[in-house]
Amino acid sequence: ISEILSKENIVFSTSRNGLNGTNENIRHIKYDVLVDELDPELLPDQIDGFVYCPGTINLRPFRSLKLETFRSDLELNLIGAIKTLQTILPRLQQSPSSSIIFYSTVAVKTGMPFHSSVSSSKSALEGLTKSLAAEFAPKIRVNCIAPSIVNTPLANKFLNTEDKIEKAAARHPLNKIGTAKEIAQLTQYLLDEKSKWITGQVINIDGGISSVKVN
């Protein structure tokens, strides 16, 4: 959000809980995508960008996953995106050039153990990205960001010791873990007019792990 605010934009954020801190350019709406309906009257008539970034990591062996886990990930990662986008699409269409950004995972392209639930739902989201990019062109751009592991509170249990951080970094050709700022900068670029010739892309930001092998 701070990257977007640095460009003097007004940001409308939604989450199940409140937003930490205050800023006159942020309008927060309490919204649980799984149970609530987003009231379009709370939104501006024109929206220039939509970023859908739910937070969840269900990494477990396939044999221990219940069917409900797959349904839950699909509801949050795919159906929630569709539901929200259907509500705000008329406002995105009012913009002369708007941008939609979804978030996937490097595990869709690479294939990683214990990622079967999240990868299933995120791969569907990547398909949605390409389909909507074709349908909404040329007025609305649609792209998807697919990161590897990023040092955020959501990933804390995987990166809560120096040994875990070093081992995770070593799996990446660039020998480092991604940061929230790096993901935010790519997001800001895809929202900006500077990326107006980019649509229908799944962009890996993953330290090279999805395409390069150095060992």
Question: Where do the PLM segments sit?
Answer:
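Substrate-binding pocket helix/loop in short-chain dehydrogenase/reductase
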Residues: 61-62, 69-74, 168
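Residue(s) in the substrate-gating loop at a strand-loop-helix junction
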Residues: 105
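Short, flexible catalytic-loop segment of classical short-chain dehydrogenase/reductase
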Residues: 146-157
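Alpha-helical segment proximal to the catalytic Tyr-Lys
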Residues: 90, 133-138, 196
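Short C-terminal tail/terminal secondary-structure segment
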Residues: 188, 199-215
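Active-site helix of classical SDR
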Residues: 85, 121, 129
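Active-site loop-to-helix junction immediately N-terminal to the catalytic Tyr of the SDR YXXXK motif
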Residues: 65, 111-119, 131
